[in-house]
Amino acid sequence: MSGLLRFAKKMRAWGHVPRDLGRIVRSYRQRTKDGSVCYHNWYPCNDYEDEWFHRFIVRNVGTDHRYHFFSVFGSRIALAMPVQNKVFVSGENVHIPNASAEIYQDYALDKVNLSLGYDDIQDERYIRFPYWLLYMFEPVIDRKMIRERIDEINRAENTRKFDCALIASHDQWNMRSPMYEALKDHLDISCAGKWKHNTDDLWTIYNNDKYRYLSEFKFNICAENFDTPLYVTEKLFDAFRCGTIPLYAGAGNQPELEIVNQDAVLLWKKEQSDHSAFIQEVLRLARDEAYYDKFVRQVRLLPYTEEFVYEKFTLLKERLMKMARA
């Protein structure tokens, strides 16, 4: 703890407010019981043991060393802590102007041993590691398990009980409103989140089980919060795993080209002024069962997905073990 005390004195010399110091000291308590992972500026979490990265380390790396995982939910001052084995992770879009995560658009590469994010950056300290990997795959380096998961997603079917689902807390950057307005008079859109909320079924009937809920719908409006190339979150993959057709906007109209079958997604191209072709395609799918069958049974994840996931997991293991040996 002496290193932390020296760091605290340095912070006071810099004139930083006590709140920053308190946050950093408290972050030392945000660690797993085995001591292998300590979280700083991290996502809200009820169980640090069950966090994906901790489970990855337990299963693939071992718990002999402590790793410090940092994210975007706090001051960059935390990155200056005198600790070893620093890993920065961003599942957020760091390129939204004036958003809080923008201060991390460099992925803290000069402050950590390893950084993970959505962007394609050529740096030995960086791995492109999109956050949807954590939602779709267990933290196990096993080709068979990865292949089985891909097959499961490709075979997923929805019940077609309802028209269209939309689950969102906001639309601050106007990514969802245009699509919603264009379709609301043609489809019954169930808005189960805070934004445009018109149903409590997600909670009262499905006990907040988002996947069981989405699997009841023909379509899912799953636009990103902001349109940035390469930024594809779990939203698109949630639609796939639930067997529903994603009505997607984001990623510069090119969501994970090596992974996602673009023909299995209906893309709302926000830069276009005329969306009549998109609307007509949705309506045909909604009304023509045979046409819907043909569309929804397409392969969603391309063959390269297995290699992509396996390579990312293997590389993460290698980098974590290498930094611990340094």
What are these regions (language model features)?
Residues 93:
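Acidic, polar ligand-binding/catalytic clefts
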Residues 3-90, 98-326:
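Pol beta-like nucleotidyltransferase catalytic core
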